[in-house]
Regions:
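Acidic anion/phosphate-binding donor-loop and adjacent secondary structure
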Residues: 66, 146-150, 163-182
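Short His-centered aromatic/hydrophobic patch
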Residues: 88-95, 113
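Conserved acidic donor-binding segment of nucleotide-sugar-dependent glycosyltransferases
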Residues: 301-313, 322-328
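Nucleotide-activated donor-binding/catalytic signature segment of Leloir-type glycosyltransferases, i.e.
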Residues: 230-249
Length: 360
């Protein structure tokens, strides 16, 4: 049996969620017998060791700053590899893939939307116009699919929602680590920037402490907006939270951190389809999150009381306190339910099979 050639295109292989999904997809396709090549053009190589470990071929076509230079380099790479299908992730790579197809290269094209569109500016309209030359447009969230269907009717028939997968063998629970302590251990995994609402959580934690509850917060993620990060540090100092709220750099092996804490929190103002929320649930961890994008779908009806308004410090603090009042038995029950939900929604097998159906 002759398997197809699949080229996976993305701007860079930095430490983000979209990059993790792309290299994961590439490794799963290779495992299914496809001839896979990952191509990227920005100098972010975080996931290269993963590709090497999985035996997935990759090619860095860097050194191009202008769009025309990137186009030529990626065009030549696609021509050389001769893929039957191209799967692109992220807006810039999606647009490049559409332009290369317009330039005469013949391949099945699947473009994947990895974020939640906030406004239809000129660049976004151009991107969606180019998507008309793809075979499928694959948002990773139902919220983004709804937005595109509502605002870009020409793309409705191309839309197929494929939500993210989680490595359920890597992200697993250890219920023996759950214990009833006075101090609630809360975890956040996100870059430090405005959209992630770090300042909002800091203010909510201050309110929780003022209500007489003990809490420790560990935030794992790099600072992508230095001014905002400095504002966060100043707020921590102003509220005397230096022994409560801790910042840590992002780390490749975050799975163990999920198993050390009592509760995961995602306070973002908006999201695409958040990998870390799915990972936390896969680890059997209770979660609270802002009621935006697909968070309600991810968490399910059993967790409706743990959704909050990210613009309301009071609502966020009340949600934390509501969880803090629960017994250890109830917390364990929530964690087990979350694990079962993750097994049903976020399996690798379901994820890759949906892409294979589109490739064929």
């Amino acid at each position: 049996m002759v398997f197809m050639k699949v080229l996976c295109l993305i701007d860079g292989l930095g430490s983000g969620g979209a990059q993790r999904q792309l290299v994961g997809l590439a490794s799963l396709l290779k495992k299914e017998g496809y001839d896979v090549l990952v191509v990227y053009y920005h100098g972010d190589h975080f996931f290269v060791p993963f590709l090497k470990e999985k035996g997935v071929a990759y090619r860095y076509v860097g050194g191009a700053n202008r769009v025309d230079e990137k186009f030529i380099k990626v065009f030549k790479t696609i021509k050389s590899f001769g893929p039957d299908a191209v799967i692109s992730y992220m807006g810039g790579a999606n647009m490049l893939a559409c332009l290369i197809r317009l330039a005469g290269r013949r391949f099945h094209l699947i473009v994947s939307e990895r974020s939640l569109t906030q406004r239809l500016d000129l660049k976004t309209r151009l991107k969606f116009f180019l998507y008309r030359f793809s075979d499928y447009v694959v948002p990773n969230s139902h919220a983004e699919s709804d937005f595109i269907a509502r605002n870009i009717p020409a793309l409705r028939k191309k839309l197929v929602t494929i939500t993210n997968f989680v490595d359920l063998d890597r992200f697993y629970p250890d219920y023996t680590l759950f214990r009833e302590e006075k101090i609630l251990r809360l975890l956040c995994v996100a870059s430090v920037r405005r959209v992630k609402n770090t300042l909002g959580l800091i203010s909510a934690v201050k309110r929780v402490i003022d209500e007489g509850y003990a809490i420790r917060v560990d935030w794992f993620g790099d600072s992508l907006e230095d001014d905002y990060y400095q504002d966060c540090l100043q707020s921590v100092e102003k509220f005397h939270l230096q022994d409560v709220f801790y910042f840590h750099a992002s780390m490749a092996d975050i799975a163990g951190e999920y198993r050390k804490v009592d509760l995961f929190c995602m306070p973002s103002l908006y999201e695409g389809f958040p990998n870390v929320l799915c990972e936390a649930m896969a680890c059997g961890l209770p979660v609270i999150a802002s009621n935006v994008s697909d968070n309600a779908y991810i968490m399910g009806k059993d967790n409706e009381e743990f959704l909050f308004d990210p613009c309301s410090v009071e609502d966020m603090a009340a949600c934390i306190i509501r969880f803090q009042k629960l017994s250890l038995e109830k917390r364990l029950q929530i964690g087990r339910t979350n694990r079962e939900s993750a097994l049903q929604k976020f399996s690798r097998e379901n994820f890759v099979s949906q892409y294979i159906r589109l490739i064929k």
